[in-house]
């Protein structure tokens, strides 16, 4: 297993340094697990491997221009060089990655390896995985120290379905990326491994909870990674870092073996530097192969049972056409422009109306002027590719947001945590109750009994959703009403999908106190942003994608989000590809090797 090397704050920084700088030092010098790697590979590989795509990499392998070992070592060297500053990767799997690379090199040298993609959609492709995604014999930290207690570690007994499918596709696992505790934050600070910085400016937030993966991928630590998304956690951080983040139709990709935040909302999907790589990775994540290009059901995730019948057929790369946007129509949701807001996890029907109204008001997220300008500018790329943008106050108005907000999932959270521990927990604990018996402390309410933000609101009783008589009123009925309105609006206005900003604000500077979004007051605390108004996608389970949409005046990225009807994932990827080919908005970050304070390690 990887051996972590811990770094602490240099004592010299604590004696003659202004308070603001000490706070920043705390961010930049929190514990981090990194492993030694060899000397940097020859610089001549930079031109071949920097920003390399999956098809380009496979071509290099086919022509024997590089070996898998060289490619893996090049990426490991970038992690060693830059990760101490950005802290995107919590654990490096150097030994395992090089062993796998050597095995693949022997296959390549044998002369009997099939051509790509028959040899595996991701054959020899370096990837990273998020810390809530189970890998056999590795600790699934879920970003939380409590799963790392000596003698009580959450050591995965087997791979998650996602990891098993990526292995089968030939991917090489380089490391595990940082994430906030339980994926329950809009930023990327973890009790287990500290803070991840934005690759475009380390002072700023990369967003969360997949901020570690997006920082690793945009920084060329790996070609691809996986993210998870309960309320925006693939899409929002992708927007901050000029990468492509994909939220599949729920049920297309299995979440079995991924530590849940809220199993009714959770999803997983690819994070990549371009749409083509995202489409290839998504195909692999569904269990597709070149010989059998159909999504596979996973017995451990019943929501995948009908994927093969409902999904668009074939590998998703076949939908990537430069002209895919011609004649398409996209509506802009009115409630997002108005900043109506949707409380995360919704509000169960059993919550009193007064408390529900107060919670809805607290969720208001005004769209910042700079984000509105960036969004309107990004729409020009859609128009240039042949699409029409429709603004209409009846397109998902604030009443839609209110319907969605009443699809409450909080009473059913513990059910998902229990199911995960039953199948992917260590020998010591296979349930919420087992964890308390084994460690002497309970699991936090976040994953066993969440409540509304208001401190005076009592916790909801945890129930099994299949047997709870209130489940229809709490969740199923409002979700279906919102989904019906989503589809009916598309039909009424002859729309193909929706387009909107992936966040309500630019990435915040985490070295400065932040203002509350809904009051304008100063909180005096570090950021919990950039905030997003896109958790409705999770409740509905429709597919959505974030693509690079340009940059703010300060040089930080803006992300454009597009959503489609359920199971139209191929169409959605095609639209994103067409937008990408017209705009070419992505520009990689310029990374630094020094901290923001003198002599920082």
Regions found by a protein language model. Give the residues of each.
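Flexible glycine/proline-enriched surface loops and loop-helix/loop-strand junctions
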Residues: 145-148, 196-199, 209, 258-267, ...
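Structural helix-boundary/capping segments
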Residues: 81, 172, 218-358, 376, ...
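N-terminal secretory signal peptides that target proteins for export/translocation
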Residues: 1-17
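Short helix-loop capping/hinge segments that flank enzyme active sites or metal/cofactor-binding pockets
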Residues: 45, 116-118, 122-150, 327-359, ...
